[in-house]
Amino acid sequence: MSVRLADVIDVLDQAYPPRLAQSWDSVGLVCGDPDDVVDSVTVAVDATPAVVDQVPQAGLLLVHHPLLLRGVDTVAANTPKGVLVHRLIRTGRSLFTAHTNADSASPGVSDALAHAVGLTVDAVLDPVPGAADLDKWVIYVPRENSEAVRAAVFEAGAGHIGDYSHCSWSVAGTGQFLAHDGASPAIGSVGTVERVAEDRVEVVAPARARAEVLAAMRAAHPYEEPAFDIFALVPPPVGSGLGRIGRLPKPEPLRTFVARLEAALPPTATGVRAAGDPDLLVSRVAVCGGAGDSLLATVAAADVQAYVTADLRHHPADEHCRASQVALIDVAHWASEFPWCGQAAEVLRSHFGASLPVRVCTICTDPWNLDHETGRDQA
């Protein structure tokens, strides 16, 4: 069975929804024809010349880091990145990026990192707020007209909750108003305070149907100026967001946990470094694949003993250590995100099976490639 690039993109967009990407990010298809047949997929953190060399003809290169992001106004073949784009296109190869959408997806980059170091994830470190895609309507209507108004908003699309329709809640109360000159009150008269037995009717409706529900409510409501409220509902987080929090099988000293990280992650020139009491017992850990010092304040307030991330800068780390007992473990950026490659590969394998060969490129693309102390070359 042949697999089109568009089919692969559909699966990747389901696993790593583009809506989760940061506003500044660039994710999705970089080059390639969605209608073309894809013979294989290679997964890597970065698109470098050495990585591109490993992508077979008519293959897709799925990467985490965007090749084209900031300030790109040319892909000329005599530029470092442009030459890669030309090489890919000339041989029928495609390039696709899942970056901050993969960071926040569930499972995503930090889930893969947590799993690699032996954590059982039980929370999101910095959850993504749910999209406000539902409204709650509160409508105040004379009791004798409440059924008509309720029926009208139901017809306009309100009142659906899961597998149920015509859902509403109401309570009796008393409405009060004073009509002034120019008004045409349906009940009472100008200049007289009126008190009316009313129902407070509550329903939910899709935010996209707001105009239709409003028009239906106004048409069915007897009042010239109906009283109503619209509340945009934000659903609770559903597991997406930056970073994860998880537990070790049993507590262990920080020095042992650091050794665990060193063994679990692929070797890099910069290795693993930590800040904290070596004898601190660690059982609950926060992780964030990629640069994570923006979450230090969140980590300090979390119920964790250690934080694993990358690219920790001197001053933010110093300020954290002065104010918090949470140990810091800084690993190479590439190493913290490499476990995601296996996760992404498994997403595709589980969907396409033998019809689409998928492999993980193990080339270390961390820019730091020489360990001065040992002379070990990671290139």
UniProtKB/Swiss-Prot annotation:
InterPro entries: DUF34/NIF3 (IPR002678), DUF34/NIF3_bac (IPR017221), DUF34/NIF3_sf (IPR036069), N-reg_PII/ATP_PRibTrfase_C (IPR015867)
Residues that bind a divalent metal cation 1: H64, D103, E337
Entry-linked Pfam families: DUF34_NIF3 (PF01784)
GO molecular-function term, one example from the UniProt record: metal ion binding
Assembly mode: Homohexamer.
Family indicated by similarity: Belongs to the GTP cyclohydrolase I type 2/NIF3 family.
NCBIfam families, sorted: YbgI_SA1388
Protein name, as recorded: GTP cyclohydrolase 1 type 2 homolog
